[in-house]
Amino acid sequence: MQVDLNCDLGEAFGNYSFGGDHQIIPLITSANIACGFHAGDENVMNETVKLAKEHGVGIGAHPGFHDLQGFGRRNIDMAPDEIYTLVAYQLGALSAFSRIHDVKINHVKPHGALYNMGARDKDIAHAIAQAVYDVDPSLILVGLSNTLLISEAEAVGLKTASEVFADRRYESNGQLVSRKESDAVISDTEAAINQVVKMVKDNKVTAKDGTEIDIQADTICVHGDGAHALEFVSKIRERLTKEGISITKLGG
């Protein structure tokens, strides 16, 4: 049994520091690197690609809406062709730095509102998937388990990775509880670890209302901007190892 452990990184920009990338990156197997729209900038992207390469961590593009103020977590009404170019543009930006450092981009994971809209809306999901395929059909598209983003990616011919969240609660339909709700984020380390182990070993998660739902766990996300991110990653890794679960980057 194996699983990938990923984290959203490279989200600082300009004079604003963000997250504990240098402490977290040795503990993960895949990094989702912000591409300058919801967070990150050219200097941070360059440094984060370099850092990921140094630690043998899989490099992923993390495209989002052009929304620094809202950190890419606000829904923006865009046509599918606009979503397509939005994603392709950001993949191009990260590709430049991957070439500079002679390392290949391994995967793509949309950020925030774009990720959630792609999980629910078939046209948006298709636009994201088609953009990724047209830029590089060998890339793995990461999406919320059992959602339209995964099925549309498979339909266009992409490899996929179904993602689960260590630090988020679930609705009974498999969607994430909205961050607007006070209990959307799990701050208790033990609760997060127990949720992860159940998802990976049993392919089940307990929803907010107590419902047991099926879930596919190819990769586990811990948010790099979370207050407990470093503690979560460290202890989740330790527990998975004790459970005999191999932690391996996407694609092996």
From Swiss-Prot:
Cited InterPro entries: Glyco_hydro/deAcase_b/a-brl, LamB/YcsF/PxpA-like
Pfam families: LamB_YcsF (PF03746)
Gene Ontology biological process terms, A to Z: carbohydrate metabolic process
Domain of life: Bacteria
Subunit note: Forms a complex composed of PxpA, PxpB and PxpC.
HAMAP family, alphabetized: PxpA (MF_00691)
Name assigned to this protein: 5-oxoprolinase subunit A
Taxonomic source organism: Staphylococcus carnosus (strain TM300)
Name of the coding gene: pxpA
